[in-house]
Every structure is written in C-alpha cells, then in structure tokens.
Amino acid sequence: MVKSEPKKKPQSGGFFQKFFRKPEKSQKEQRLTVQRSIPYLEMGRDGICRVEEHLYSKTVRFYDINYQLAQNEDKNTIFESWCDFLNYFDASIRFQLSFINHKSDMSEYNKVIQIEPQHDQFDDVRMEYAQMLRQQLAKGNNGLVRTKYITFSIEAKSVREAKPRLERIETDILNNFKVLGVKAYPLNGVERLQIMYETFHQEEQQKFDFSYDSILQSGMTTKDFIAPTSFLFKSGKDFMMGDTYGAASYLNILAPELTDKVLAEFLDMDKNLVVSIHVQSVDQLKAIKLIKGKITDLDRMKIEEQKKAVRSGYDMEIIPSDLATYGGEAKKILDDLQSRNERMFLVTVLFLNTAKTKQELDSAVFQTAGIAQKFNCTLNRLDYLQEQGLMSSLPLANNLVPIKRALTTTSTAIFVPFTTQELFMEGDSLYYGLNAVSNNMIMADRKQLKNPNGLILGTPGSGKSFSAKREITNVFFTTTDDIIVADPEGEYYPLVEALGGQVIHISSTSKDYINPMDINLNYADDDNPLGMKSDFILSLCELIMGARDGMEPEEKSVIDRCLPLVYQKYLNDPKPENMPTLGDLYDCLREQKERQAQRIATALEIYVNGSLRVFNHQTNVELDNRIICFDIKELGKQLKKLGMLIVQDQVWNRVTINRNSKKNTRYYIDEFHLLLKEEQTAAYSVEIWKRFRKWGGVPTGITQNIKDLLASREIENIFENSDFIYMLNQASGDRQILAKQLNISPFQLSYVTNSNEGEGLLFYGNTIIPFKDKFDTSLKLYSLMTTKPMEMGKYKEKKEA
C-alpha cells in the first residue's frame, strides 16, 4: 500500500496564531506504507494508546443533553459547568474533542423497526404499519450516526507510569460529565480502533471485524485492520483514502464574539464530517508572562508610532487601528487571566470532509465553509498539510497541525458540545414520531424506564387519543403484552375490533356484566389477597356513599369484618360460581347490628336491588382476550366513575394473573382526570399506579382536562411515578401550570403552544424531546384510529353496510 507525499507549503495565520505557531519539523524519512502513516505505535486492549515514544492517550465517549432546548438559566449553568470542565485540564494534559458524523448501514435501523408478517388476518394492517415506519425512517437522518468523544494524552516514560495517571484523569472526566448530567463511558482498544477504521472507511459499508486474538493468529498489527488500501496526498488541497475523496480544513476565527450555536450548526449537516477541537492548556504563569510581554511589545510599537507622528507633525494620538485593537484585546485577556478564573488554551479546530466523488467533496466543503462564514469565520484548506490534518482528526489527542489560536476559557467553551438528545432504542421499542429538531425517528421502550407509567396530555383535537391508539397498535404488532382500555367515550372499539379484541359494553341496558367482587388468589404480594381487595371495596363504598372525606373508622371496620365472611365460600373452593357479588356484601351488612352497617347497606341498595344494579352480577364475559376494551360510554353520570374504578380493579386482577406468566399488561385510561377528581377513587388509583411497575403493568392516563388533573391532591404522586409523558398542544393556563410542575423551559413550551395535531414534547425519563407525528390519512389504520366525529361516522356507515 504505497502513498504519494508532496512537499509542504507554509500556512498563514492570524495575530495570535503567529504567537503560537510551531516551526515545522523536517521529515527525516519518507513514509512508504499506509500503516506507517497512521500516527500511533501501539493500541492496548484496555484502550491505552502509545501515540509516540513517551505520549499515551485514552478516549471517553459522551452523549448529548438538551442544551439548545434548555431554559436560559439552565443554559448558563451548563455553560459555567463546561468552563469548569475545561479549566480542569492543566498544561500537562492535551485533549481533543471529536465530533463524528458518519453514514451507517441502514439495515441496522431497519432491523429495529422491522415487523414480520404472521400470515394471519391482521397482516394487511400489520404490513401497512410496517410500511409507515419505513417511510418515517426515510424522512429522518437516522442513517447518519453522530458520536462524540474526548481524548486526552499525557507524557510518561512507560505505560506503567502512564496508566494510573490516565485512569485518574478518566475518573475525573467521568465525574465532571456526571455533574453536567451527561452519560459517558471509557472506550477499550477495540472501540478506539473502530473509530479510526470508520474514519478511514467513511464511504464504505463493510463492518469493522477485529479481535486481539486475530493479531496473535495472523502476526499482523492493529494498523493492518484499520488502514485503507492507499493514501494519496498528491494535491495540496485534498487527498484520497482508497476510493474515498477527502479534504482537511481549519477554522480561522475572525469574529470578535461567537454564539454557542456555532458547533451545533456544523454538526447538523447531513454529510460525513469529522470536527476535531485540539486543546492545550498553557501554564497560568507562563500565559500571564507571555501576554504581558506582548503588551510591552505593543506599547513599544505604539511609542514608535507616536514618535513618528511628532516628527511628521500630526496628532500623536492617531495610531494604526490594528495596533489599538490588538492592544485592547491583549489587555482584556490579561484581565481575564488575572481576575476572572480564566485560563489560556491553544486551540486548533479542524474539519475533515469525505465523499465518494470529487464533486460531492467540493459541495460538502462549500456547505461547511458557508456555515463558517455565517458566523464571521473562514474555513481554510490546510494547504500541503492534508496528511497532518487527516491524522490529527483521529482521536489520539496528538495535534500535527502547526496552526493554533490562543483562546481564554470562555472563548473555548463557546464550542459547546451539546445540542439535542436523540432517542432510538432497540428491543421492544415503539414509534413515537420524529424528533422535531433533528427529524430523526424516535423509538423508545417504556419498560426500560424506572417507572414505565405514563400520561398523554393534550387539548381536544391535539391527537391524544390517536397517539394512544398508535401506541396500542405498535404494542400489538411488536410485543406479546396484553392490552386493556378503559373507554368512557366509546372511541376505541373500531381499532380493538379490527385487532381481534373484545369490546365489553357496560351500561344499565347492556347484557355484558363484570363483577366488582372478582378476586384471584394472586391478588396481593402475600398470602392474603383480601388485604388488597379490601382497599378496593372500601374505595368503592366511599364513592357509593359520597363520603368525600372518607368513611368513619367504624364503617371501615364493619366492611372489613364482612369481607372474610363474604369470600369464605370462594376461598375454600375457588370455583367461578362461588364468587360473591355486591348482593352478598349487602346481605352480610344487613345481618350486622351496628347502625353504620345499616347505613352502608342502605347506600348499596340501589346498586343491588334498584335501578343501578348493573354491577350486581357474576362476570359473564370472557376476560382472557389479548385486547379488551371496556366501553362505559352509555353508563350514566351516577355510574361512570364507579364503572371506571371497577374496570381498574378488573385490570389489577389481570395484572396479577399475568405476573405469574411473566407477561406485561398495558392499561390505557381515557378521561383519566375523572378517577383523580374524587378523593375516594384518587387514593386507590394512586396505589395501583405505584404497584403496577413491579407487577409488570404499564398504565397510561389520557386526559384533556389538565386543571382537573392538577387539582387533585394525588397528582404529585402520579407525576413522581410517571417517567413517560406524551404532551401535545396545551391551553394557555395549562401550559403555565405544567411548565412549573415539570420544569419546562419557555423554548420547550413553544412546542406545545398552538402546535399542530400530533406535535408536542416527549418526556422519557430525564430526556425531553420535541416531536412531530404526521400520520398518513389514506391508510386503513387511520380510519381505525381517528376520533374525529365525521370520520368515525363514515367508519360506522361502512361497517353497517
């Protein structure tokens, strides 16, 4: 693998670049192989690289946080913490920030969203949904992988001497990232080699195949596994790696001030790109001495100019503007170093563009240069330093480019390495739209959260019920989870029926019955299922009696005494026909002597023998279908809250059964605020909310009435136990309440202000992502999921026809 290397041409630099430009070393030997061009000596299994004879480095990968979407106060905190992070590095440590955008094999992403046909009656909608996912993936940039690294190097006589110090620096870096709320981890040797392999093969799809055992078996070196077929540095402005064209450039910072969006703009490009920021701290005393020396030089030049002015007969205060500018800049830097906790850094910002053709390369470089110009900077090609630029773009923390710019801590920190978080998980992940900032697909697995409980919040017409149905559809196609829906508005039956589920219509005229007294032997953690069931019966009776402040202790005691008597027959012989009903509890209460028992029985009478006796029957519907929808739309006002509470208890029964089968249960509660509005049902609902997680339940509350929801005393418990919130458009008053409750920044709040249908904010653990989800209205699935009255009417007409 032979390469061509022409002579080098000097490179020009700015005022401060001239101060710190190193003389170029003469090249003693002509490198004849690709491997010898790669500038490191050894790469250890543990990730420690011997770069030069006495130079060793390690690399840490770090992930993004939501900097661009943060509140100004939070932005300032992040920025100040990032300044502290930079100030950690003393003059003995070189470090390099690497930002790599490279195209990935789309097949890896397709595997995550793949839905295989099952050759059943659902294949038409299943394949339709799969096609929709592929179309959404194509809209984004998920095929472009963005990774971020920090590499640090120190000088040492041997690896034994270097290792403990590198590990100590690594620990400090990880702790500093932790302060910033940034996830990070150190790379091993294979992972570091893979980065270099991908840098040298950016336009290729072949995967990196390497293990340290391969070296022992083949006798090759690590460089043999990462090197391209050839390097060609014939031109002074670009080069070739194998069949790939490349160009290395540096950022010439001309602007007096930069915005913290400058790096984000470069990284937002949808092309292969490597941005490397090499940073070398200058010893504080040396930096101050150096700047004082430059000020002295400038003052001397100023005096000479003034003498010249006097001799020429014009005002001695008139001096060259550059001299005044440089003098002011130098004095400001000195003040920063002496009194503002600033350090001085020597910084080199490099860009590596690659492409399959020369035309594509020129286009990519032109686009990159355009962004630089937008921020009053210039992107200059490294004339006859292309090899040094390429090799300095490798994460080795060894800068071979002799062009450096002196910057203070604050000026260096303006290259904030954080933009917006992405969420694309493997496993049982579900689709939640596209990232509104990056346009990348959002795939997340709620079951990976500490608390998978969730809320879907939005104004009427914002798409909250549609979003719930889309998740239900996704769950049905990609998991084995059971799905239960509490449907107070009769909106879910078209989808449930289309997926082969069971719709249970509960009303005063319906023949579908569910028994609120149903219990199974696994109803609680311990061997006493009646303990947990008692909580439900008490909540039920409180709701029936309208006891806003709860029942009296005597009343609770009477019920608690009756329950073992009522359930005795079933617990002795657990057959379905032995299951008690509300009528059995009513009869038992009538037999008690206390007046409290008679009071409770009287309250129950209308639900046992009167016009509201719909819940005084044995369950007569099968509840073992994978998808069950409890349609309680036709229940009157008196029964709706009661019905929702009873449905919730039926769900708990199902969850306890599924737990033994190691199966998850998804539970969707529309009009969730109704359960939290009454103290009686709110307390029980929160208890269920807390217990669901360890029993394999994944509940989702859906509501448009944010004020009613937040008015509940129990809402704090709901939010604390909900790590997933899908927030759509919000009314003005609700936005302010939610902003305070969830600490949402004004910029983030704009995504739920007058937003279109299917747009909003996704809260996944500590991650907040703005999303958009435009669903194709021509799909059959759309007609099954829509809740728009006119479109639902068309579905009914079509079904009846």
Give, region by region, the residue ranges found by the protein language model:
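Extended, folded cores of ATP/NTP-driven motor/assembly subunits in large transport
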Residues: 2-418
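P-loop NTPase motor domains
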Residues: 65, 72-91, 98, 102, ...
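Conserved P-loop NTPase
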Residues: 742-797
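Structural recognition of the conserved hydrophobic beta-strand(s) that form the central parallel beta-sheet
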Residues: 483-486, 629, 666, 692, ...
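A short helix-turn-beta junction within AAA+ P-loop NTPase domains corresponding to the substrate/partner-engaging
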Residues: 500-504, 714-727
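Walker A/P-loop NTP-binding active-site region of P-loop NTPases
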Residues: 462-515
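Hydrophobic anchor at the beta1->P-loop junction of P-loop NTPases
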Residues: 456
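P-loop (Walker A) phosphate-binding loop of NTP-binding proteins
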Residues: 459
